[in-house]
Swiss-Prot record:
GO biological process terms held by the UniProt record: mitochondrial electron transport, cytochrome c to oxygen
Gene: Cox8c
Transit peptide start-stop: 1-29
Ranges facing Mitochondrial matrix side: 30-40
Family label: Belongs to the cytochrome c oxidase VIII family.
Quaternary assembly: Component of the cytochrome c oxidase (complex IV, CIV), a multisubunit enzyme composed of 14 subunits. The complex is composed of a catalytic core of 3 subunits MT-CO1, MT-CO2 and MT-CO3, encoded in the mitochondrial DNA, and 11 supernumerary subunits COX4I, COX5A, COX5B, COX6A, COX6B, COX6C, COX7A, COX7B, COX7C, COX8 and NDUFA4, which are encoded in the nuclear genome.
Protein name as catalogued: Cytochrome c oxidase subunit 8C, mitochondrial
Pathway(s) this gene product operates in, as recorded in its UniProt entry: Energy metabolism; oxidative phosphorylation
Intervals, Mitochondrial intermembrane compartment: 65-72
Key words, A-Z: Membrane, Mitochondrion, Mitochondrion inner membrane, Transit peptide, Transmembrane, Transmembrane helix
Length: 72
């Protein structure tokens, strides 16, 4: 086993990252199957609020201070 794979497996403990799997052109793959977890409504609401706040708060700041952002 190469040193990189030993290093990765020591970091991830139970997961080994395979860098060059035959038949896959350079894609990263894990040795475990993905865990399917359903999002709760609270997690969905938090995600949506963060998404919209990320875009609308800076836009609202620029719109409220538009006279300072205009080039004169």
């Amino acid at each position: 086993m190469s040193r990189l794979l030993q290093f990765c497996s020591s970091l991830l403990r139970h997961r080994v990252v395979l860098f060059s799997k035959p038949g896959h052109s350079g894609r990263l793959s894990h040795s475990e199957s993905p865990q399917n977890q359903v999002l709760t409504p609270t997690e969905s609401v938090v995600g949506i609020v963060v998404f919209f706040a990320t875009f609308f708060i800076p836009a609202a700041y620029v719109m409220s201070n538009l006279k300072f952002f205009k080039g004169e």
